[in-house]
């Protein structure tokens, strides 16, 4: 696109009594164009004055400032500019080599501007020294320009009310006599020499090589060059396609494309276009009423006069549907002048101020003029609404009038039928009430007579026995009903927890975070607990939200590898949660604590076991909780270890409920811990369950290497940047924790490293889901253990979601392998934990059931199954031959585009 189009249906600035929005004029909407494709930009409709862009040119779409408010916007070839709300200076973005990103230079210090206009490769701004006045003094105006062959300061005699830009030229409109003047390159268009003298305009709109203006009588006048390459184009509205041959309709405003122009009719605010358009171009929608329009080189966009305020485009190569709501005009601080009314959003009078900032500003739109021949004016235009025309059914001359009158007649018939129906329903209701009343009176009379009748002793005895039998049966049912009640978290008093922790003394403190402290306590019944006490913060609302989030989730979730919540306390500003006490602290303390013996105690088998158990807990959150739960703070310090060295996932303060479809993204502000935070979530605010997968991948790298997620004592402080190249190079030995001796066979650890590498991929759709991660880790654990006869904490098929640990398999007890009876006795001494059922979860699913959906994996991998009689002797080799299968799972591409553009 070679032309800069912007038009709005409202008063641009405080001192603009009429419009001058041309191709490159400033308004609430603008379009850029060029080799990289078209882009539509507009001010948001929520009154924030923030700009949003949508289109093909990434430099304009992603370069748009997301937190800077603007008065209005304009655009050119590969760039867009806006007038800053705070400083009244222009700010540009995009990829144009002549108009740089930021505030254009050179810039006069302290200069303020009231109007912008952008051409193909230049930008001009109308300077003002006093806010609200265009001229430096009463007789002169200053216009600064930047860009290709246009960088200069122009001093014009006379006050200028508006400016508009074409491809290589600029035009302005004098405020006093409403005449037009132009400057720039004359060689291509001839616009400067052909500019009319002593012709008064309400507004002007420059196109590529022509200018159109609305005269004081609302007629349109155009001058300049028309397209002569007729073999490449087809006329849109006139016989010869000449842009200078204009329609006779009265117009509110006009805009210009490269070789075409469009205007808004005063009568009905519908769009009329004329001039040349390319082949296969879409026409303007018939009957479309708009608030504002803006033209590109070969297309035009408009803001429909609907409550949605979602723009639509027509022509060639432009975006046809735009999924964003924009402001229909620029806000002004003065009251609306004669011929304008105040815009009220959603049809509510006075609510138009919500689309403007500050609150005392408003958005003014021009009134429609007159009514069609078959209509009459039922109410005139006033300060709060446009004029209203009603069809005269006795003078119908259009299809719309005929259709309206027929619908009105049908409406009257329906109203009459509805009235008759109400009468009929009332009669039926009266009859029903009468019958019911008679029946009730009869029943009461019969009951009264029965109570006062004389019954025999046998009948009384029979009735008594029947009543006793019923009560007895009812007593039997009652205990079963009580058994169905679900246990909830217990509520403790603050005094009870204060006594249990010794007054929350430092001696009982076992951990401290940014928002809470954890104390060890002993309840009156001797139960050892961990009490999490929230640190009193200034943001009480946020602290209370995190407290109730964690309380709500933990009281409903039920899994062996999630931290068990025993109770809570909320007393004034005090908020406390009571958990099971984890005797061995956190995984972080073992891997990175000051005591080196803790690190040595975690041999490779225990480390991988902890990883498998934590993965199962996260898999439960993603796959079996309904709706799914996204933890958002998976890290080694939030994986706790109990007295049996089983892992528990803890700290649900940042957790949120995900959508029922786990692949659907959420738009959330980033929350979590640096080093573990998903890069895609951090940059794009694109949150899915794959964000937890990334954090868990970092934890796997910690388990393998013994290094912190971020450790600045190393040259490469980020563990992902350090570990991933080693894994891809196959140098696993350099990755492993030097504190532990590497196992004789590194194959299992190589598989775990490969899983971690896939988990920390930059794009979420390339990461595996947690069920696939868990399956791969279970296989790696089995391969690491080498044989089912070796004492192992948990085998891949021995854990059921919802129970802590299972007894060893019966087949293992009767195995022909050399397993001693003492080993079996020790293995049977396991702690079984029972939890209340969870009403937010699906039924528990075993790891073997999880893999039933991928039946015959051995056949797909080219492996053969051994005979059942040889299982005891060959299961170790069978487990070693298993290969992990992790395929990426990602949301659909259209969802990604929808949530980011």
UniProtKB/Swiss-Prot annotation:
Induction: Regulated by GRF10 and GRF6 at the transcription level in floral organs during floret development. Residues 889-901 have a biased composition (Polar residues). The active site is at 633 (proton acceptor). Sequence repeats lie at residues 31-66, 70-105, 123-158, 160-193, 201-234, 251-285, 290-328. Disulfide bonds join 336-364, 367-381, 371-389. Its EC number is 2.7.11.1. Receptor protein kinase. Could play a role in a differentiation signal. Controls formative cell division in meristems. Regulates epidermal cell differentiation in many organs. During floral organogenesis, required to maintain the interlocking of the palea and lemma, and fertility. Triggers culm elongation. This is Serine/threonine-protein kinase-like protein CR4. It comes from Oryza sativa subsp. japonica.
């Amino acid at each position: 696109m070679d032309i800069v189009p912007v038009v709005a249906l409202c008063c641009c600035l405080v001192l603009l009594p009429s419009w001058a929005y041309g191709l490159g004029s400033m308004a609430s909407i603008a379009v850029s164009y060029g080799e990289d494709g078209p882009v539509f930009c507009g001010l948001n409709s929520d009154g924030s004055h923030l700009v949003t862009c949508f289109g093909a040119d990434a430099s304009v779409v992603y370069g748009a400032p997301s937190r800077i408010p603007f008065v209005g916007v304009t655009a050119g070839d590969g760039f867009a500019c806006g007038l800053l709300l705070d400083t009244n200076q222009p700010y540009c973005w995009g990829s144009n080599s002549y108009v740089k990103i930021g505030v254009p230079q050179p810039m006069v210090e302290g200069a303020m501007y009231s109007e912008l206009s952008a051409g193909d490769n230049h930008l001009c701004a109308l300077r003002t020294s006093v806010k609200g006045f265009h001229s430096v003094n009463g007789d002169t105006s200053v216009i600064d320009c930047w860009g290709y062959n246009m960088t200069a300061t122009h001093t014009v005699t006379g006050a200028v009310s508006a400016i508009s830009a074409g491809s290589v030229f600029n035009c302005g409109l004098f405020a006093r006599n409403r005449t037009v003047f132009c400057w720039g390159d004359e060689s291509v268009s001839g616009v400067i020499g052909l500019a009319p003298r002593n012709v008064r305009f309400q507004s002007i709109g420059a196109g590529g090589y022509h200018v159109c203006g609305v005269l004081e009588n609302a007629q349109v006048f155009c001058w300049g060059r028309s397209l002569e390459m007729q073999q490449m184009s087809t006329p849109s509205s006139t016989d010869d396609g000449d842009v200078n041959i204009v329609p006779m309709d009265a117009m509110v405003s006009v805009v210009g494309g490269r070789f075409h122009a469009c205007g808004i009719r005063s009568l009905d605010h519908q769009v009329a276009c004329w001039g040349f358009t390319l082949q296969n171009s879409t026409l303007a929608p018939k009957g479309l009423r708009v608030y504002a329009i803006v033209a590109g080189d070969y297309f035009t966009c408009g803001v429909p006069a609907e409550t949605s305020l979602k723009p639509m485009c027509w022509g060639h190569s432009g975006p046809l549907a735009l999924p964003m709501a924009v402001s229909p005009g620029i806000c002004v601080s003065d009251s609306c002048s004669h011929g304008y009314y105040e815009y009220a959003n959603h049809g509510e009078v006075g609510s138009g101020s919500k689309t403007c900032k500050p609150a005392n500003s408003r958005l003014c739109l021009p009134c429609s003029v007159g009514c069609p021949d078959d209509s009459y004016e039922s109410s005139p235009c006033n300060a709060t609404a446009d004029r209203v025309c009603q069809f005269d059914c006795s003078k119908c001359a259009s299809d719309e009038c005929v259709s309206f009158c027929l619908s009105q007649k049908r409406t009257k018939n329906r109203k009459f039928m509805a009235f008759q129906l109400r009468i009929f329903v009332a009669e039926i209701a009266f009859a029903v009430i009468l019958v019911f009343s008679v029946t009730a009176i009869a029943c009461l009379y019969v009951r009264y007579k029965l109570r006062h009748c004389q019954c025999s002793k046998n009948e009384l005895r029979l009735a008594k026995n029947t009543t006793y039998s019923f009560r007895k049966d009812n007593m039997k049912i009652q205990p079963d009903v009580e058994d169905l009640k679900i246990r909830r978290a217990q509520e403790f008093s603050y005094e009870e927890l204060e006594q249990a922790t010794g007054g929350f003394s430092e001696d009982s403190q076992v951990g401290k975070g940014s928002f809470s402290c954890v104390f060890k306590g002993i309840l009156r019944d001797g139960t050892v607990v961990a009490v999490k006490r929230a640190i009193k913060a200034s943001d009480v609302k946020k602290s209370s939200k995190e407290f109730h989030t964690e309380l709500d989730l933990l009281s409903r979730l039920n899994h062996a590898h999630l931290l068990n919540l025993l109770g809570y306390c909320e007393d004034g500003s005090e908020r406390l949660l009571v958990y099971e006490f984890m005797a061995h602290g956190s995984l972080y303390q073992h891997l990175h604590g000051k005591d080196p013996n803790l690190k040595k105690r975690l041999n490779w088998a225990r480390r991988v076991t902890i990883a498998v158990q934590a993965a199962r807990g996260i898999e439960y959150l993603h796959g079996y909780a309904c709706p799914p739960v996204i933890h958002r703070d998976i890290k080694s310090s939030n994986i706790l270890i109990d007295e049996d060295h089983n892992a528990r996932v803890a700290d649900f303060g940042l957790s949120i409920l995900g959508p029922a479809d786990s692949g659907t993204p959420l738009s959330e502000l980033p929350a979590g811990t640096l080093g573990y935070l998903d890069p895609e979530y951090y940059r794009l605010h694109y949150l899915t369950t794959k964000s937890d997968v990334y954090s868990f991948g970092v934890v796997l790298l910690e388990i393998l290497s013994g290094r912190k997620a971020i450790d600045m004592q190393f040259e490469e402080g980020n563990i992902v940047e350090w570990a991933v190249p080693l894994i891809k190079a196959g140098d696993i030995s350099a990755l492993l924790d030097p504190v532990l001796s590497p196992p004789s066979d590194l194959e299992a650890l190589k598989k775990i490293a490969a899983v971690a590498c896939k988990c920390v991929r930059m794009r979420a759709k390339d990461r595996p889901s947690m069920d696939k991660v868990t399956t791969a880790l279970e296989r790696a654990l089995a391969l690491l253990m080498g044989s089912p006869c070796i004492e192992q904490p948990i085998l891949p098929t021995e854990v059921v979601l919802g129970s802590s640990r299972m007894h060893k398999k019966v087949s293992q007890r009767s195995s022909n392998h050399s397993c001693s009876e003492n080993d079996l006795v020790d293995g049977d001494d396991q702690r079984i934990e029972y939890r209340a059922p969870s009403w937010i979860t699906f039924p528990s699913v075993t790891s073997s059931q999880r893999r039933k959906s991928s039946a015959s994996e051995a056949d797909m991998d080219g492996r053969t199954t051994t005979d059942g009689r040889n299982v005891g002797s060959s299961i170790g080799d069978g487990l070693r031959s298993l290969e992990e299968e992790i395929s990426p799972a990602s949301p659909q591409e259209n969802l990604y585009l929808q949530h980011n553009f």
